[in-house]
Amino acid sequence: MSPTNRFEDDDYPAYTMGRAAELIGATPAFLRAVGEAGLITPLRSEGGHRRYSPNQLRIAARARDLVDQGTPVEAACRIVTLEDSLDEALRINEELRGSTPQGA
């Protein structure tokens, strides 16, 4: 993968903690908290610094929106996790229904 393509990869850990926090309108402490709650797991650089991907930032931003509405961080992380699990279950259910012959 070329260096330019890495920034187009939603899973490439391109952002430092400070830049990631700035991009989602949060603090580094918030990113540490959602990491400790298990919502996201940033990659660690060789120097031990956290690096975040665009996908991880989208997930963290969803939690931040809930926290901004008054939800505790751990509860917000759990809500986001459950929403994603439900979306995945619905997607799988739809795939299975689509592969079932009509009238079966």
Question: What residue spans do the PLM features occupy?
Answer:
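Arg/Lys-rich, alpha-helical DNA-contact motif
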Residues: S2-P13, E22, E36, T41-P42, ...
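Residues within the helices of the helix-turn-helix
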Residues: M17-G18, R32
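N-terminal cationic amphipathic segment used for targeting or macromolecule association
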Residues: G18-R19, I24
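Short coil turns linking two alpha-helices in DNA-binding domains
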Residues: T27-F30
